[in-house]
Curated annotation (Swiss-Prot):
It comes from Mizuhopecten yessoensis. Keywords: NAD, Oxidoreductase. SUPFAM superfamilies: 6-phosphogluconate dehydrogenase C-terminal domain-like, NAD(P)-binding Rossmann-fold domains. Catalyzes the reverse reaction of octopine dehydrogenation. Acts on L-arginine in preference to other substrates. Pfam families: Octopine_DH. InterPro entries: 6-PGluconate_DH-like_C_sf (IPR008927), 6PGD_dom2 (IPR013328), NAD(P)-bd_dom_sf (IPR036291), Opine/Lysopine_DH (IPR051729), Opine_DH (IPR003421). It catalyses: D-octopine + NAD(+) + H2O = L-arginine + pyruvate + NADH + H(+). Its EC number is 1.5.1.11. The gene is odh. This is Octopine dehydrogenase.
């Protein structure tokens, strides 16, 4: 039986996944890209040729994977109808358009995958798919599986590196779907090895969407407005106060997880780790001094040379607050977590402090006196936006 897979998107991740998945036996790949004329451009660029994925292996060798998607289209009816798996490889702000496009055509037995999903993926999917949402299964990945770059649009993409392990959460629907883990493993290959998280809220809480805003706040929170000579180091340039803020925000995440388990027995969020433990687990090979969080971040070799987003101004450079570190991580991250914290009845003053500072920098109003009543809440993915106002509604997807 042919496995029908729809890959949504036209960027680096969509190119990579389309090429890898289409190379597997018994897999039919349809690409759906809603952006402008991207589907037409991709179809024209590929012509009658095959899509090439250049994979840089861990042993230093290169492998070329050649394959061809069955169709590249802007028409959701063509791409979605009959698809066993629908995988979104687009930024979180674009998910809404794809959910709306697939809603009339997605089958009850579909597995809908966010690769990656970002916080609020399940809330948005449930809201837009309506009655169908109870039937479909939803899978959320924490990040993309690879570092990848398009080398020639529509024709060639390079995988610079592949993660060894990647966690996903699963909400099983009432309809029978393909086996989620083994199917995704088949499409990707031997690596990354996929593991299942215990709970979808574990993934939401452990997205640690406060990290980028906290580092920006640590460097620019008391900035005098004068240009600096060069972009400061981002991760490796943090101070102890920023590390302390990261720890405080992480402690609030754990408190929310514990409150949910206490209020709603049967929901296991015991794998929610503090951020220091997370660093030790994920970056143990790259950290040179692991005796505390500050040193774990500042001596992390994978962060070498990464600098703050800046823009050139007279006299030097100034912070670029229009960067995705705030424009995505606040509405698609911190505000979603805040919504869950409100439903759990847990105050999160350190997270609130970062949100209040960041929303002013990007010209938005989400949080007003600690409540999600700002005019821009409707542009976020917090559960309250969709009518999931209680823990029970958040956990079950049933609005009350």
């Amino acid at each position: 039986m042919t496995l029908k897979v729809c890959v949504c998107g036209g960027g680096n991740g969509a190119h990579t996944l389309s090429g890898l998945a289409a190379s597997r036996d018994g897999v039919e790949v349809r690409v759906l890209t809603l952006f402008a004329d991207e589907a037409e451009r991709w179809t024209k660029a590929l012509g009658a040729d095959e899509l090439t994925v250049i994979v840089n292996e861990k042993d230093g060798t290169q492998t070329e994977v050649k394959s061809r998607p069955k169709v590249i289209t802007k028409d959701p009816q063509v791409a979605i109808t009959g698809a066993d798996v629908v995988i979104l490889t687009v930024p979180a702000f674009a998910h809404e358009g794809y959910f709306q496009a697939m809603a009339p055509y997605v089958q009850d037995s579909a597995l809908i995958v966010g690769l990656p999903s970002q916080a609020g993926f399940e809330f948005q999917c449930r809201d837009i798919l309506g009655d169908k949402a109870a039937a479909v299964s939803m899978m959320s990945f924490e990040t993309l599986p690879w570092a990848c770059r398009i080398k020639e649009f529509g024709r060639k993409v390079e995988v610079l590196g592949t993660k060894s392990v990647l966690a996903a959460s699963l909400i099983k629907g009432t309809a029978e779907t393909v086996d989620p883990l083994s199917t995704l493993q088949k499409l990707h290959g031997a690596e990354p090895v996929f593991r299942l998280a215990k709970h979808f809220l574990e993934m939401l809480i452990m997205s640690y969407s406060f990290v980028h805003p906290a580092i920006l706040y640590g460097r620019w929170g008391s900035w005098d407005g004068n240009p600096v000579s060069e972009a400061p180091l981002f991760y490796q340039g943090i101070d102890q106060a920023t590390a302390d803020m990261l720890t405080a925000c992480s402690d609030e995440c754990k408190a929310v997880g514990n409150a949910i388990m206490a209020a709603c027995p049967g929901n296991d969020l015991s794998d929610v780790k503090d951020i220091y433990q997370w660093y030790l687990e994920y970056y143990h090979e790259d950290i040179q001094d692991d005796h505390d969080l500050y040193h774990a971040i500042t001596t992390n070799k994978s962060y070498k040379g990464l600098v703050h987003p800046v823009k050139t101004v007279d006299g030097g450079v100034a912070p670029d607050f229009g960067n995705r570190y705030l424009t995505e991580d606040i509405p698609m991250g911190m505000i979603v977590f805040k919504g869950v914290a409100i439903a759990a009845g847990v105050p999160i003053p350190n997270n609130d402090k970062l949100i209040t500072w960041a929303q002013e920098k990007i010209g938005k109003v989400y949080l007003v006196d600690g409540a999600l009543t700002g005019k821009d809440v409707a542009t976020t993915r917090c559960p309250q936006r969709y009518g999931f106002n209680t823990l029970n509604a958040i956990l079950t997807g049933k609005k009350e």
